[in-house]
UniProtKB/Swiss-Prot annotation:
InterPro entries: H3-Acetyl_Activator. Expressed in flowers, leaves, stems and siliques. Interacts with HAG1/GCN5. This is Embryogenesis-like protein. It comes from Arabidopsis thaliana (Mouse-ear cress). Its main location: nucleus. The keyword Iron does not apply. Keywords: Activator, Coiled coil, Nucleus, Transcription, Transcription regulation. One of its GO terms (biological process) is response to cold. Residues 98-118 form a coiled coil.
Length: 177
């Protein structure tokens, strides 16, 4: 291992100085093995798991400990938060509701399509009622969201989702004819 690589590793993972023996044979594992049964357990509750790198020769018993990021928790904590341009603390809630509305929108369109396919059958009334309920749920969720957000967010939501909502209303009208 070159010296500048060791410095890079020190700065990236441990922020501590490293002792590197001259004749090093490395065996690395991202997790420590807990017992003889083979169960693998993380070494601590921190965001990093320890991996020991030990020398294969029996002449020296020195070992190195590097901290390697535990990818799952490291990713979740450093995940970007996307917002709708608001400076308030509600963007994750708004995004969650928008995702739910989009999901319900897709379900409502499927219900309308199934009702249109059953137009001249005995199942039409049931399918049409399910489609009306699904559209009503989407419209209720969208209006509820518009009532909870600021004017700036409301305008943004109208621009991004208004056309889809109008499309849903038009498809429902077409079903009712």
């Amino acid at each position: 291992m070159r010296l500048h690589s060791a410095i890079t590793l020190r700065n990236l993972f441990t922020r501590k100085s490293l002792r590197i023996p001259q004749n090093l044979s490395i065996t690395a594992s991202p997790l420590l093995i807990g017992d003889v049964s083979g169960q693998i357990k993380p070494s601590s509750t921190s965001h990093y798991s320890k991996s020991s790198l030990s020398e294969a020769s029996s002449s020296s018993s020195s070992s190195l400990i590097f901290q390697i990021p535990n990818n799952a928790s490291f990713f979740l904590e450093n995940q970007r938060r996307y917002s709708t341009g608001s400076s308030s603390g509600s963007p994750p809630d708004v995004n969650k509701v928008v995702d739910e509305i989009n999901l319900k929108f897709a379900e409502a369109r499927e219900e309308i399509e199934m009702a249109m396919d059953a137009k001249e059958t005995v199942y039409f009334n049931e399918e049409a009622e399910c489609a009306r309920d699904a559209v009503a749920e989407v419209l209720e969720m969208f209006q509820g969201l518009l009532g909870k957000v600021t004017e700036k967010e409301k305008a943004s939501l109208q621009r991004s989702m208004g056309l889809k909502i109008e499309q849903l209303k038009a498809e429902l009208e077409q079903l009712n004819e």
